[in-house]
């Protein structure tokens, strides 16, 4: 905000002011206003009529300043009044801007006694202004008025004196009084100075005491801190000592346990080595390798499907020849106990298996017997077929086996799948295993076995069934190297049911009395032998022992063993290794338990054998396999019962 300016019309302003304050001049008032549109102050008018004339020159649209001289009858000198006129029609913004100019205007016009603010003529009252001047509210000092008074004093007349004679006593009292007060004043100053020094000393002493106390407190805190640190350090050392002792004790215990563990491991290793050596020694004492038995049986089973069957009187029923090929019963395989399976999965069992492999690879295979004559191979007898079936069935036992509940043969009617499978297997094995030198005594025994088979099955004709004796004979007695009561049948035969019609004539049935019959067992003893499942003896460890077969030729019929049939099959076609090989060859699919007794490779060989023989129907296998495990057969130790059994043979 810009202030009032006196530079533009300064001379005019001062000239009018001098005219008013000079006593010789007749003018007693002057009126000032702003120049249009600016803050420059200028002279508007002046006159000699006093307040009455000045009040008539104020305008309502402007801001104006009136300087007037008022004479009082009681005062010797005139009084000066400054009137601040703000018209009623002046804008508010202009009023605010000019409000700060009043002080500067009063300073410019020196000697102003009273400042009167007015916005109308009624506000300018000569009586009110005179009252304010007489009450002493106006200023009494002014540079102009001071000069005027000095001028009046110079013109004044001299006055009389007021001197009086000096009194010594009074003067001494005055002097003494003054000295006393001066001395008192000095003493007071000294006292104050001493008090100030004492206060300063007290403050210094207090500060020193405070600092000393703080130092002592700091030392006490440091002492307590050091004591605490010492306690902590001592506790830490004790803790470390305890931890070191605990670590030593633990290390000592670990060393003791480690030595004990090492001793146990060494003892276990020695025991394992002794078990391996013992197993190797036991395996080395075996005359034959059980693995070769499974190979031979597998090859016989694979080749039997491809061979062409010769018509026999017992297989001329409609559908019997087809069912015999479709329903082939799997050869029973011995199962393993849980203890054997758990042993095979241990490192000791693995070492035993490796030792078995080494011993097996070092043993030469048994020599096969001479091949059978061509006549009997081409035209096998049904009696020999049934005998081969009964003789091959016990050879499937290779160790102690726990027979499951479902192993018992269910009741079968005429033409059941199990009976057809029995005839099919007998016929095919008879083709492969025809006897080399038929004997009269052996033929008698074979004749009885054929009669027993015809009695157990219902697939033969009624006329043939009538010619067979009803007594049941223990077929296990025909097993070579087995002795009396060595084994019993696994299934219970049922009485045959005659078929509805006679489809096989007597002319097709061979004469059964061409050889001398063997004396039959008593009826009670035969039934007890067939039906007693609780007294089954354990078969020997090996079944393919040529020496045992030769040694017991009088008690059993001399039939060609499996190696002879195997030799014939190898001359015709070399089959692929199948799932029944005991760990020497890798299983093709690894799903023997889910796909059935025969693996996929055997099914392929059966498919190839069908091309060789157009008369043979496609084989049908069962999907439910026997619950056995033959993967680690050689790793199983020979039980004591088997050793005693072999010793008895």
Swiss-Prot record:
Residues bearing Phosphothreonine?
Answer: 331, 335, 346, 497
Residue numbers of N-acetylalanine PTMs: 2
Give the Phosphoserine positions (modified residues).
141-142, 337, 339, 345, 416, 601
Q: Which Gene3D superfamilies match?
A: Severin
Which gene holds the coding sequence for this protein?
Answer: DBN1
Q: Which GO terms describe its biological process?
A: actin filament organization; cell communication by chemical coupling; cell communication by electrical coupling; generation of neurons; in utero embryonic development; maintenance of protein location in cell; neural precursor cell proliferation; positive regulation of dendritic spine morphogenesis
**Tissues and organs where the protein is expressed, per its UniProt entry:** Expressed in the brain, with expression in the molecular layer of the dentate gyrus, stratum pyramidale, and stratum radiatum of the hippocampus (at protein level). Also expressed in the terminal varicosities distributed along dendritic trees of pyramidal cells in CA4 and CA3 of the hippocampus (at protein level). Expressed in pyramidal cells in CA2, CA1 and the subiculum of the hippocampus (at protein level). Expressed in peripheral blood lymphocytes, including T-cells (at protein level). Expressed in the brain.
| Hydrolase as UniProt keyword | no
Instruction: Please name the PANTHER family in this protein's record.
Output: CORTACTIN AND DREBRIN (PTHR10829), DREBRIN (PTHR10829:SF1)
**Ranges of Pro residues composition bias in the record:** 363-374
Q: Where is the composition biased (Polar residues)?
A: 334-348, 582-594
According to the record, the residues making up region (Disordered) are 208-420, 477-502, 538-620
Protein name, UniProt field: Drebrin
Q: Indicate whether Acetylation appears among the record's keywords.
A: yes
Q: What is the effect of changing residue 10 to D/G?
A: Loss of binding to ZMYND8. Loss of ZMYND8 cytoplasmic localization
Keyword annotations: Acetylation, Actin-binding, Alzheimer disease, Amyloidosis, Cell junction, Cell projection, Cytoplasm, Developmental protein, Differentiation, Neurodegeneration, Neurogenesis, Phosphoprotein
